[in-house]
Amino acid sequence: MDDLTAQALKDFTARYCDAWHEEHKSWPLSEELYGVPSPCIISTTEDAIYWQPQPFTGEQNVNAVERAFDIVIQPTIHTFYTTQFAGDMHAQFGDIKLTLLQTWSEDDFRRVQENLIGHLVTQKRLKLPPTLFIATLEEELEVISVCNLSGEVCKETLGTRKRTHLASNLAEFLNQLKPLL
């Protein structure tokens, strides 16, 4: 496990939860995750859940993605998706508003790996360098990804070579995120 990335993710999650507490006097609330089982759920309302991050309990790797492509995935990606269970968190990096993706449960972790595999299949078919997404943007065809060759974080337009460098590594990126509520 990449300790710098794990700590940066935990630190951002704490900043996010602290901001939520400050603004709403509660743990983060999600309507989107209502009815979806997770160890993160601490209480349920009529149409939403309150959540708090929990330690990841499964195998701490995305080996299914590695096996599917017979490639080695950046250690930071293993760490990013296996440090904790949490809800997705809205954030800002510079002037970019994003949703930082998280694994919600062990079932969700399997789905995330399947989506990463699908993303890599498309990139391979289009002969694009491999990236692994970590966040979504309002623009549907743009994501924040980690380049699997260099470990750099970039804003990527899906299906194209258009990439904008954002940070030299995932820990640096996470450390610069500001929570958005």
UniProtKB/Swiss-Prot annotation:
A GO cellular component term found in this entry reads: cytoplasmic side of plasma membrane
Highest taxon of source: Bacteria
Membrane topology term: Peripheral membrane protein
Q: Any idea which UniProt keywords this protein has?
A: Cell inner membrane, Cell membrane, Membrane
Q: Which Pfam families match?
A: Syd (PF07348)
Quote the InterPro entries the UniProt record gives.
Syd, Syd_sf
Localization (cell): Cell inner membrane
State the family named in the UniProt similarity comment for this chain. Belongs to the Syd family.
Under HAMAP family, the record lists: Syd (MF_01104)
**Functional description taken from the UniProt entry:** Interacts with the SecY protein in vivo. May bind preferentially to an uncomplexed state of SecY, thus functioning either as a chelating agent for excess SecY in the cell or as a regulatory factor that negatively controls the translocase function.
Protein's UniProt name: Protein Syd
